[in-house]
Amino acid sequence: MSRYELTVQVRTRYLPEQSEPSQDQYAFAYTITIRNTGEVPSQLVSRHWVITDAESHVQEVAGLGVVGHQPLLPPGESFEYTSWATIKTPVGTMRGEYFCVAEDGHRFEAPIPEFALAMPRMLH
């Protein structure tokens, strides 16, 4: 176990009611679970996302916290939230990182592994 470590799990779903395929707008919800698997209480301060569609168009999003929160996670605790993104193709990817500060002042990044955004039945 690393002294400073947050692990990230992701679930996604297509949002047909928010999408307009005829206008190249595909919306996806993603639910993130962030768990402090380290040894020190740590706070998520900011985030950076790289969102890529099937035509290699890239959007970058950065900002403070997540959904209005900067959660402080003691070891073993987790925080879950749901947000959404839109892309211009029925398939794409997201990846990124959370920027964190441990209780002792140490700064570190928690990687968000790349995950797929895909309409149902678009990926085999």
Swiss-Prot record:
Residues 1-124 form the ApaG domain. Gene3D superfamilies: ApaG domain (2.60.40.1470). This is Protein ApaG. It comes from Ralstonia nicotianae (strain ATCC BAA-1114 / GMI1000). The lineage of its organism: Bacteria, Pseudomonadati, Pseudomonadota, Betaproteobacteria, Burkholderiales. The gene is apaG.
